[in-house]
Amino acid sequence: MKKIYVSGNGNVSWEKFQQFYIEPLKKFNLDECEFIIGDFSGIDTLMMEFLKDKTEKLTILHVGKRPRYFANSFKTKAEKWKVIGGFTSNYERDIFGIDLCTHFLAVDFNTDEKRKSGTLKNIEKCFALNKIKV
């Protein structure tokens, strides 16, 4: 079972989501994958919408008491998704998700010379722990 941690920026376009997230997943049998994602707008919410009718094997990680977003679960596989919350920071949540995964799917569009995005930090952590890039 591949455990795929999905990370990405909030300001991604639909076209970039398709190109950098959906296209790489096409080489996998989704029945052999489990997904671990956050609850932020952008990649997380787009991935929830993409996966809600494709898999029950998804865990949403969130800071605080409840997720900021959850896909409609009426007559979808999302009704079986797991939710793990109570993290005190995005960093704590991301480390937890990275520790759980065997693979990762992440692309950074926001880092520049002044700022390293959380997505890039997650990519670096995954590589440092020898996680497999999707």
Each language-model region and where it sits:
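Short, hydrophobic/glycine-enriched beta-strand segments
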Residues: 2-10, 37-38
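Acidic/glycine-enriched connector segments
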Residues: 12-134
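Short, Lys/Arg-enriched, disordered terminal segments
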Residues: 1-2, 134
